[in-house]
């Protein structure tokens, strides 16, 4: 079971249709995206990586299995891009990383999504808990890195 499938299982258990991931380390872990300025939506209908036009080519290269969404195409608004993804995917209850979302950003997103009858629910440590337990591949890669460093 890969990390996205694990996240989907957790979402299902919490009654969520999808999750909006904003913490840079979590975005990288779940998508493979190596840079900053990106956000991820995971839901059963698909995986989305939101970034701007400077990074879409990089995102397409590093994030197979993700639809890359250029937020510049949505009035240069990340919340509007998120709203579009939720509408497209049929998300009615969206989790978000409450510890990594500013109140200002929450209010802006909540205003848009609530107008579409989409509920936002704060989540904690969904991706972090996956990051704590290392897969065999992650352990092997760490060993290789240690050998190279020696």
Predicted regions located by residue number:
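Terminal domain-start leader segments
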Residues: 1-48, 79, 84-90, 111, ...
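Conserved beta-strand termini and adjacent loop/short-helix elements that scaffold enzyme active sites
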Residues: 21-22, 69-73, 121-125
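Structural motif
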Residues: 22-24, 51-53, 72, 96-101
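Glycine-rich nucleotide phosphate-binding loop and flanking beta-alpha elements
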Residues: 27-28, 57, 102
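Short amphipathic alpha-helical segments
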Residues: 32-33, 61-62, 106-110
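Short, hinge-like loop/turn segments at secondary-structure boundaries
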Residues: 36-39, 66-67, 112-113, 138-140
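Compact, glycine/acidic-enriched structural inserts
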Residues: 52-80, 84
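Flexible, acidic/His-enriched mid-domain "rim/lid" segments that flank
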Residues: 77-150
